[in-house]
Amino acid sequence: MIPPPAGGSGSAPTGTVFDSTGQFVVSANGLSGGAIFLFATEDGTISGSPAVDLNNAILAVDNSASGAVYKGLASAQIGSANFLYATNFHDNTIEMYDSGFNLVNTFSDPNVPPRYAPFGIRVIDGKLYVTFAEQNKEKHDDKAGPNHGFVDVFDLDGSNRRRLVSRHGLNSPWGLALAPANFGKFSNALLVGNFGNGHISAYDPNSGAFLGQLQDQNGQVLTIDGLWTITFGNGVSTGPANTLFFTAGIDDESHGLFGRLDAIQ
């Protein structure tokens, strides 16, 4: 169970991180331990589930009072230190926390158009990839539409921002994954999952050039309602390294879907 913010009655989790370092220690009710899973929520909280009680996450960050809306979460190591990165969609910023859950940095892209804010986030090959989506009036949810989106790349400390993709093939982009060398037509491509229309677009990971979109066996562009996470297996416990797994909130996020995509050419 993921706890609600102070005074709340429920939580809406978004980003999830698995952490094997044990450095993100959470404590409550006499229990303490390194979080195995960490969760960000649209309620403005970050929680962790320690090994001693995996079924009950413990609140570590609560920024609900300031209106924070976390849409994504990632983790990375700089030297011997571990950090969390949360995309605060409401406040148009990426928040960087150390292993003690102290806020150590905030950053964003000042050059995106007004009302665009960090949405999805993932560490790929030692770089921080961040998607940007358009905010709705309340700055709580995205405003979907063709070409509504950007993808940036940052160093792990938030510096050296570089725009990789602008608009083309994007529609409230959230999921990110780098394809392996044996994923058919889109081998070695950066894949971006669009929450807005359920399409998965492929780009050159260096130049950002648009390469196309994933299609089904009949040549039709794949559409996955409510598409969220996309990730490849690790070749061992989480499945084949060239199988793309996905999660989705189908039927306007009232149900969940977990599936897989395999390249046939």
Residue ranges and their predicted role:
Residues M1-Q265:
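Sequence/structural signature of beta-propeller domains
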